[in-house]
C-alpha cells in the first residue's frame, strides 16, 4: 500500500518505477524477439524458397555421367550452372552464389518471391538478386549489376529482389551462360528413395566436387543456431533480476520513509 500510495503521490517516484520496470520489460522483449526472429529462418529458406532435396556440383566433363546416374532414379532433377563470383554495382561489390537455370525447369525447385508477390525466374540478361545482397550493393529492380565470369564482366538488369535468409544469391538465365556447360544438379527425392544413398552415389562419380543434402545442411545450421537459446535465457534472467532489484529498492525506500 505504501509503495502504491507513494508512486501516485510523488511523480518522480512514479517515473523511477515506470522507467525501471519499462527498461526491464524492454530487455526481456528484446531477448524473446531475437529468438523469435530467427526461429523460422530455416523453414522459410528450405520449405518456401529452395524446394529441392539435394544438390551436386561437378566438372562439366562429368555432366554425362552425373545425368546418367540421376536418370536411373525415380525422383526428378534439373541441371544448370552454379559458381561463386564477384557481383558489382555502382555502390560496391560482393561475392555471391550465382545460379543459372532454365526458367521453365526451375519451377518446383526454386520459388522466388518477396513479401508481396511471386517473382518470375529471369530470362535473357536479367537477374533476380537476394534481398540482403541487393541492400549491400544498393540495387533494386531496374538497376544494373555486373558478374565477373573469369575476368569478363557481364551486365544484367535486375528484375526483382527476392527473399532469402541464408547466404547471398543471384539467379540468372541459363541462356545467358550458354557457353558454359551445366556443372550443377538440383535433385528431388523420389518415392521410397534414400537420398543419402543417392548422395553417396554422386560422390563416387569422378569429377563431382560437392554434394549437399538439404536435410543435413539444415540440421547443421539448426545446431549452430541453438546457441541463440542460451543467449535468450541469459538476457531474460538478467531482465528479471534487474526488475526485482528495482522493485526491491523502491519498496525499501518507501518503507524507510514510512518509519
Predicted feature residues:
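Small-residue transmembrane helix packing/gating motifs
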Residues: 49, 121, 161-196, 215
